[in-house]
Amino acid sequence: DNECVQAVRDTCKLLESLGHHVENSWPSALNNADFSGKFTAIWSTNMSVGRNSLALMLGREVTINDIELMNWTMAEYAKKMTATDYAQAVYLSMLFRRAVQQWWADGWDLLVTPTTSQLPLPIGTIRNMPESPMDALRIAGDWIPLTPPFNTSGQPAINVPLQWTKDGIPVGVQIVAAYGREDLLIRVASQLETAQPWAHHTPNI
């Protein structure tokens, strides 16, 4: 959405007004960040392990009625994965992390992106549908394409609701730092909130 893009532009202008230097740059690895296929083996295997752990906690078999349908489907998909599939996904994940982190190693401090590609979705948009259990994951993936890369890379990131629509809907901006630089994120977010407070905003429900 244009409002998500504009939120980033306005945030960058605010950062400049606070004395920060802003340039148009990003990790080139993000241009081809396809998570749907490459890392399915990791996600589904982790879901299967989680389901097994839940069974141990409950002291019984976990049934399809115990967890969300999408999670159940992912756990079942893990049965199709081989050890080689999993190892390959872990290897690709490692390569991706290194490629993304190189941007920070080249001297950049922070990356500013939209938190979501669209404005916040109405309640009920993402649902578990028995006839298409993976639709929820697909919709979520289309909505938040720029947060999974940093879940994978393990870097600290923060979401700041600096912009608001005329209808009172928050428009989040994501700021990402290098490994171990949570201190930088908190300092910059504090500067932004002081300059443009958001605590008094209450979105309509």
Segment roles from a protein language model:
Residues 1-44:
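Gly/Ser-rich, acidic/histidine-flanked active-site/gating loops
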Residues 35-46, 127-129, 173-176:
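Short low-complexity, flexible loop/linker segments enriched in glycine and/or proline
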Residues 104-105:
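Basic phosphate/pyrophosphate-binding loop/patch that engages nucleotide-derived ligands
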Residues 109-110:
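Short, Asp-centered acidic motifs that coordinate Mg2+ and/or phosphate
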